[in-house]
From Swiss-Prot:
Record's compositionally biased regions (Basic residues): 1-19
Pfam family, one: Ribosomal_L32p
GO cellular component annotations of the record: large ribosomal subunit
Name of the protein in question: Large ribosomal subunit protein bL32
Species of origin: Maridesulfovibrio salexigens (strain ATCC 14822 / DSM 2638 / NCIMB 8403 / VKM B-1763) (Desulfovibrio salexigens)
Gene Ontology molecular-function annotations: structural constituent of ribosome
Superkingdom in the source lineage: Bacteria
Name of the encoding gene: rpmF
InterPro entries for this protein: Ribosomal_bL32 (IPR002677), Ribosomal_bL32_bact (IPR044957), Ribosomal_zn-bd (IPR011332)
Keywords of the record: Ribonucleoprotein, Ribosomal protein
Family: Belongs to the bacterial ribosomal protein bL32 family.
Annotated region (Disordered), positions in chain: 1-20
Length: 59
């Protein structure tokens, strides 16, 4: 197996890892006031873009 010729410094290691973070998800608020992920139907009221797409009994 290949072995590194030089020890990787903490600075170089951390610079390489600078893009490895987890992005925070976008949150929008439904008409009912519930926070939801964009482009998804609301799980509490069942609406999407102002229309009822899921029955209230199912949601």
């Amino acid at each position: 197996m290949a072995q590194p010729k030089k020890k990787t410094s903490k600075s170089r290691r951390n610079m390489r890892r600078s893009h490895d973070h987890v992005a925070t998800p976008n949150v929008v608020y439904c008409e009912c006031g519930e926070p939801i992920i964009p482009h998804r139907a609301c799980s509490s009221c069942g609406s999407y873009k102002g229309r009822q797409v899921i029955n209230s009994e199912d949601a």
